[in-house]
From Swiss-Prot:
GO terms for molecular function: 3-dehydroquinate dehydratase activity. Keywords: Amino-acid biosynthesis, Aromatic amino acid biosynthesis, Lyase. Substrate binds at N75, H81, D88, L102, S103, R112. It catalyses: 3-dehydroquinate = 3-dehydroshikimate + H2O. Disulfide bonds: none annotated. Pfam families: DHquinase_II. It comes from Pseudomonas putida (strain ATCC 47054 / DSM 6125 / CFBP 8728 / NCIMB 11950 / KT2440). The gene is aroQ1. Its EC number is 4.2.1.10. This is 3-dehydroquinate dehydratase 1. Belongs to the type-II 3-dehydroquinase family.
Length: 151
């Protein structure tokens, strides 16, 4: 049984009401519930945290190493374009991660085109709405299964 951690950055607590044209009508609670059910059905454990505070996300990443978290799914939200500290935390714990964005950041304002995470992530999923989280979970589970196979 693997343990996966889902991290949601700033303002994602407002999903469902915040700019639904960009982010959709699905709430964060619905996303977490869907992911938790899918992980459990596959025999795995899922943890999650949403925070508007960078240091809380960093502290949670640090704790993940000591808890034996096997994979991280992260939507850094606005921290995508600003947070070297979050990037450094992810690199420091050496837990593979997938970067997720609800909207297609490349179709938005130019300042949203740069990510401090994409070049060190296992993969990036953007622009697919809440389905992006499901696809990221499926990919993480596939990778964990492949890595568990004897070579």
């Amino acid at each position: 049984m693997a343990t996966l951690l889902v991290l949601h950055g700033p303002n994602l607590n407002l999903l469902g009401t915040r700019e639904p044209g960009h982010y959709g009508a699905v709430t964060l609670a619905q996303i977490n519930q869907d992911l938790e059910q899918r992980a459990r059905a596959a025999g795995h454990h899922l943890l999650y945290l949403q925070s508007n505070a960078e240091y809380e996300l960093i502290d949670r990443i640090h704790a993940a190493r000591n808890e034996g978290v096997d994979f991280i799914l992260i939507n850094p939200a606005a921290f995508t374009h600003t947070s070297v500290a979050l990037r450094d935390a992810l690199l420091a714990v050496s837990i593979p991660f997938i970067e997720v964005h609800l909207s297609n950041v490349h179709k938005r304002e130019p300042f949203r085109h740069h990510s401090y995470f994409s070049d060190v992530a296992v993969g990036v999923i953007c622009g697919l709405g809440a389905s992006g989280y499901r696809l990221a979970l499926e990919s993480a589970l596939e990778q964990l299964a492949a890595n568990a196979q004897p070579k």
